[in-house]
Regions:
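P-loop NTP-binding core
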Residues: 1-313
Length: 313
């Protein structure tokens, strides 16, 4: 069974989507792992980064190709979804003219913006409250059902969550073994981490109770906290600058040393230069104008990937 990980932060601009893509790339190249990416955010940023905006538009709009929207459309229509037909294989760009053969992706769609309201309105009447609870669990299990269908094909599944706790995000949590919080070392990025953990503890408790009450086989397995990984860290003299170092230390003091990745990703123009070409920063040899910074960021990102493997087990 794959390790399923939700990437979440309620604060935008922390590099969550970039981190998700690079974890997949690093897991594939550094650790020879098979990875499935799922873009749950209606902004579609992971989809754009992974295959390129023009390729995405051609696939999702010009050709009306499958996206996550089709999965939920089938749920509302009480129709089955064949997971293999939704996943794009050998489309995630590795470098100029090359793709990752071990990374698949389920693309997002902008119409997912309205999905949460539609899910909230979806009510199925049961013979009793227990059966209605089963129906509520089905609503939370749409993503999990897709993952379970292709579980033997992947070692990791990474879910890029929107910055909220709506029913789409709850679908991701329900399916996940872990959740990881990308952050930048500033107050606004880190202030909500305790609240995220509080909500996750509550979700775990609620889901456990629902599962038991519905009389489903087995037990619900909690989604565990995988850690906080810092991104866009300014360095000086071989370590974080004072302001960023203090914020990282403050987070460690509040959350515990084991809650924070020992490795981080530095700030620089390498990742942004790579993103403009729809490439991961690991393709730094294709980025002559930002080669030095890109190579440095690639090395730091690689260390984060290696630590991720030791944490998510």
């Amino acid at each position: 069974m794959p390790q399923v990980v939700s990437m979440i932060n309620w604060k935008g601009g922390v590099g969550k989507t970039t981190m998700t893509l690079h974890l997949a790339a690093g897991l594939a190249t550094r650790h020879n792992k098979r990875v499935l990416l799922i873009d749950l955010d209606a902004q579609c940023n992971l989809s754009f980064l992974a295959i390129g905006a023009s390729s995405y538009i051609t696939h999702a709009y010009n050709k009306n190709g499958p996206t996550l929207k089709n999965v939920f459309d089938n749920y509302f229509a009480h129709a089955p979804t064949i997971a293999a037909n939704i996943i794009l294989q050998k489309q995630v760009r590795a470098r100029a003219g090359k793709i990752y053969t071990q990374v698949g992706i389920i693309l997002s769609h902008q119409e997912l913006t309205l999905l949460d309201m539609k899910l909230a309105r979806e009510k199925r009447s049961g013979r009793d409250h227990r059966e209605e609870t089963k129906f509520e669990i089905e609503k939370l299990s749409v993503i999990k059902a897709i993952i379970d269908e292709v579980a033997s094909d992947y070692d990791y599944v990474l879910l890029d969550c929107p910055p909220n706790v709506n029913l789409v995000t709850q679908n991701a949590f329900f399916a996940s073994d872990y959740y990881v919080v990308p952050a930048i070392p500033d107050f606004l990025s880190t202030v909500g981490i305790s609240l995220i953990k509080k909500y996750m503890d509550q979700f775990n408790s609620d889901y456990t109770s629902m599962w038991s009450y519905a009389g489903l086989p087995g037990t619900y397995v909690d989604t565990k906290f995988g850690g906080i990984v810092f991104n866009m860290v300014d360095e000086y003299g071989g370590g974080p600058k004072d302001g960023h170092r203090q914020m990282i230390q403050s987070t460690i003091s509040q959350q515990g040393k084991s809650s924070v990745f020992a490795n981080y990703v530095t700030d620089g123009d390498g990742i942004s230069a790579a993103a403009q070409m729809n490439l991961p920063v690991f393709a730094y040899s294709d980025l002559p104008r930002a080669h030095q910074n890109a190579e440095k960021q690639a090395n730091y990102m690689g260390q984060v990937v290696d630590e991720f493997v030791t944490r998510i087990i």
